[in-house]
Amino acid sequence: MPCCPTKSGAAPTNRNYELQGEMLKDIGGMQTYFTGKRSSKVVLIGFMDVFGLSKQIKEGADQLANHELAIYLPDFLNGETASIEMIDPKTIEQKEARSKFMEKISSPLHWPKLTKVIEDIERIHGQDVKIGAYGFCWGAKVLITYPNKERFLRIGCAHPSLLDPVDAKHVHCPVCFLCSKDEDPEEVDAWKKSFENSPYFSESYFETFGKMHHGWMAARANLSDPENRKYFDLGYQIFLKFFKELF
């Protein structure tokens, strides 16, 4: 998959974990996983990777929601997710399917959906609600290129892909970058350097986890593996500390 630096698919889910949230039928016109405090004035929007609303990102949202936050995970792909054949296509048909899927995940196609999600959150939680957002892989790209990103007070990016230093010049809030060993370090450094002149740089956080693979906080997280579990939990703890500044 051109948006991912590795060719592995989604990992098996944690069967022993019981989700704490619920599916809502219509947030921004999409089915959405919600977890957390309904009356919270601090809301986070989670933007999935190409594997959709995986159980892993729902479990991560539950971890964040245990701390007085309200978390919304909209299904921006409407149930359509990347298959392993799209990740590593072998045949002409598989390559064509990947090309069509890549067209569907073009960031500008999802900006209007994101705007509708924000509007619904403001309707539910009030105009004075504080909104942050976090995304995985491709989802991080959508967030940092969103034209109305000033509505976000903070943006978290886990194993971000498709990094372009030009994007950094248009981000108007602190960011938290949690990168894996698979992201190109030169691309990460170029993005960070482009952001250094931002007044929000001093409040931002960048860390690369050299033992972790691309996707360790999302659908590629193998939570039966002790080391992946350790860094999965640590990643969400870092996100929580970053977003707690909104309180």
UniProtKB/Swiss-Prot annotation:
One GO location term (cellular component): cytosol
Subcellular location: Cytoplasm; Nucleus
SUPFAM superfamilies to which the protein is assigned, alphabetical: alpha/beta-Hydrolases
KW DNA repair (keyword) present: no
Record InterPro entries: AB_hydrolase_fold (IPR029058), Dienelactn_hydro (IPR002925)
Record GO terms (molecular function): hydrolase activity
Key words, A-Z: Cytoplasm, Nucleus
Similarity section: Belongs to the AIM2 family.
Name under which the protein is recorded: Uncharacterized AIM2 family protein C977.15
Protein source organism: Schizosaccharomyces pombe (strain 972 / ATCC 24843) (Fission yeast)
